[in-house]
From Swiss-Prot:
It comes from Yersinia enterocolitica serotype O:8 / biotype 1B (strain NCTC 13174 / 8081). GO terms for cellular component: cytoplasm; plasma membrane. It catalyses: (S)-dihydroorotate + a quinone = orotate + a quinol. Pathway: Pyrimidine metabolism; UMP biosynthesis via de novo pathway; orotate from (S)-dihydroorotate (quinone route): step 1/1. The lineage of its organism: Bacteria, Pseudomonadati, Pseudomonadota, Gammaproteobacteria, Enterobacterales. PROSITE patterns: DHODEHASE_1 (PS00911), DHODEHASE_2 (PS00912). The keyword Secreted does not apply. Catalyzes the conversion of dihydroorotate to orotate with quinone as electron acceptor. It is a peripheral membrane protein. This is Dihydroorotate dehydrogenase (quinone). Binds 1 FMN per subunit. GO terms for molecular function: dihydroorotate dehydrogenase (quinone) activity.
Length: 336
């Protein structure tokens, strides 16, 4: 009810300042009686995926709560799962500002944040304090100053630390804002990374006596051949799930709009059709051998249904949440 007014005020601010302001308010509410201000009840629509039981199929995509500061307040809004991160072994400030832009007419966002986060140890402390009753995913990446050839070490460091606290772990090899990162999606580099991650998962499973599934997050900007190769690698290495998709470098759908020439990844409605097409193609290739978490431009019940019809078992929102507010969560979960 009140979100249009809140949005109008927030959209007067620079996007990153609006984000920081919102998170300051959410942190003040978290764990207090005032948390009811952001709480809403949504129907329970259980889904079993990656060996986990989700209370509903709608999650928050990584990138909004990078450091796990507002898990409880966001959880109170009705998400079945929340993915925090992307987090890296060491804290890093990310790219220079401004680095986040609203494409208001297209209901899209361009970001070149660059994995700004306070580091994996800080994230874990925040996760320990949270009481979220849903599934918590932790999205991990590599530090900007770690050479790509040594990138897998950063993923293994993060895995080692987050494993006891994660419902699932997401491997981000598809952000366009860390130089060279997307090269880890291809050929031998991907096989080498997935083999190391699977070995680490086996070791941690034995050490902690619990199995934490691993999902790999891929880009939308892949050729047919690359998509087929990735699907093959994921199956061969027994990866538990795939998150499709991250942001796009393609600007064809926002030509002529304000900020369309800004560098970074484009998300929101302009990504909707492309991400759904990647999910559909991936689903045909995987033949149910591992589940797909669908993300990219979901801003309505119809868009959510399209992702699931294309082959997604679970779905996530981010930009649609910014443009439509918490009401979108209730709407999707109720009518999906």
């Amino acid at each position: 009810m009140y979100y249009p007014l809140v949005k109008k005020a927030l959209f007067q601010l620079d996007p990153e300042r609006a984000h920081e302001f919102t998170f300051r308010q959410l942190k003040r509410l978290t764990g207090t009686p005032l948390q009811f201000l952001v709480s809403q009840s949504v129907p329970t629509k259980p889904v079993s995926c990656m060996g986990l039981s989700f209370k509903n199929p709608l999650g928050l995509a990584a990138g909004l709560d990078k450091d796990g500061e507002c898990i409880d307040a966001l959880g109170a809004m009705g998400f079945g799962f929340i993915e925090v991160g992307t987090v890296t072994p060491k804290p890093q400030s990310g790219n220079d500002k401004p680095r986040l832009f609203r494409i208001v007419e297209a209901e899209g966002l361009i970001n070149r944040m660059g994995f700004n986060n306070h580091g994996v140890d800080n994230l874990i402390e925040n996760v320990k304090k949270s009481h979220f009753g849903g599934i918590l995913g932790i999205n991990i990446g590599k530090n900007k100053d770690t050479p790509v050839e040594q990138g897998k070490e950063d993923y293994l460091i993060c895995m080692d630390k987050v494993y006891p606290y994660a419902g699932y772990i997401a491997i981000n090899i598809s952000s366009p804002n860390t130089p060279g990162l997307r090269s880890l999606q291809y050929g031998e580099a991907l096989d080498d990374l997935l083999a190391a991650i699977k070995n680490k998962q086996t070791e941690l499973h034995q050490r902690h006596h619990k199995y934490v599934p691993v999902a790999v997050k891929i880009a939308p900007d892949l050729t047919e051949e690359e998509l087929i190769q990735i699907a093959d690698s994921l199956v061969r290495h027994n990866i538990d799930g795939v998150i499709a998709t991250n942001t796009t470098l393609d600007r064809s759908l926002i030509q002529g709009l304000n900020y369309c020439e800004q560098a970074g990844g484009l998300s929101g409605r302009p990504l909707q059709l492309r991400s759904t097409e990647v999910i559909r193609r991936l689903s045909q290739e995987l033949q149910g051998r591992l589940p797909i978490i669908g993300v990219g431009g979901i801003d309505s019940v119809t868009a959510a249904r399209e992702k699931m019809a294309a082959g997604a078992s679970l779905i996530q929102i981010y930009s649609g949440f910014i443009f439509r507010g918490p009401g979108l969560i209730k709407n999707i979960v109720t009518h999906i």
